[in-house]
Amino acid sequence: MSASPTAGQAGLSYRDAGVDIDAGDALVDRIKPFAKRTMREGVMAGIGGFGALFELSKKYQEPVLVSGTDGVGTKLKLAFQLNRHDTVGQDLVAMSVNDILVQGAEPLFFLDYFACGKLDVDTAATVIQGIARGCELAGCALIGGETAEMPSMYPDGEYDLAGFAVGAVEKKKIIDGSTITPGDVVLGLASSGAHSNGYSLVRKIIEVAKPDLDADFHGQRLQDAIMAPTRIYVKPLLSLIETLPVKGMAHITGGGLTENVPRVLAQDVTAVLHRDAWTLPPLFQWLQAQGRVADDEMHRVFNCGIGMVVIVAKEDAERAIRHLQAAGEAVWQIGEIRERAEGEAQTIVI
């Protein structure tokens, strides 16, 4: 029996199966200029090859590679609902580069994974343009990625994202929290909003409260406040690390303040945070009021206006604050480190 189509019959194609190779090629052409703007020293071969090549700088004597991977979570559901895809790319980059930053690593390169049921070139290009913008803010190269069109795997109009960042730090300069002692000061850097965490609760609050997402909210639309892209702290904090001893950092992501700060603390110390040291931003006030969310729940779900925590010696605190403010960051002294009492939580908000 012949496997070839008989006369008058058209053979099946990949397009018939739901995969548009031409659309994929068109997307690659669209995103190449975005990726090109992120190129930096060390990139040997980027988008287009089977593997991307990156050469470590000779400035490192004992380089340690630091890697991180993350997604954007259910914030994507709001992106689909609102048909706005311009911010989630920066979110994707921020989640990984901010994570590797806390160990003192300079982000070197980034790869993305974009998966969908049916590829919409305009939507995907908008997302990847945001990824490239995030890479520029972090100083890392968008060196490669994967776009997977998988019919029936995702509903029309929906997609998922994953990102992967690799950075490097000098071995003797790794920041791991091991030098944190009682009396050290906890600094908090302002977030730009809810960043990319707690959005299952955000969506539930929206479902229950049914707000007008186009309504004015402190000078912008409510949806703009909710969808604000995650702040990327790489450049100001790398500069700070070169200026004075940073003992520890915590990226405030899933788990909020009370579950992320302990990740950089030894078992014998506690971070005491003072809620009156900074003003709870309007978005979080609105979320708490509309959802009747308890204070403790707010602190373990949301960043509550603090996107990154930095721990320094007391004598370095004022200089660190001035340095970060000069770099454009809003920063507050939000607490201190003390000896941990038996059975006490490692981060408490009072």
From Swiss-Prot:
Q: What class of enzyme is it?
A: ligase
Report the EC code(s) recorded for this entry: 6.3.3.1
Q: Which UniProt keywords apply?
A: ATP-binding, Cytoplasm, Ligase, Nucleotide-binding, Purine biosynthesis
Question: Which family does this protein fall into?
Answer: Belongs to the AIR synthase family.
Matching entries from PANTHER family are given as:
TRIFUNCTIONAL PURINE BIOSYNTHETIC PROTEIN ADENOSINE-3, TRIFUNCTIONAL PURINE BIOSYNTHETIC PROTEIN ADENOSINE-3-RELATED
NCBIfam families membership: purM (TIGR00878)
Protein name as it appears in the record = Phosphoribosylformylglycinamidine cyclo-ligase
Q: Which organism is it from?
A: Cupriavidus taiwanensis (strain DSM 17343 / BCRC 17206 / CCUG 44338 / CIP 107171 / LMG 19424 / R1) (Ralstonia taiwanensis (strain LMG 19424))
**Name of the gene this protein is made from:** purM
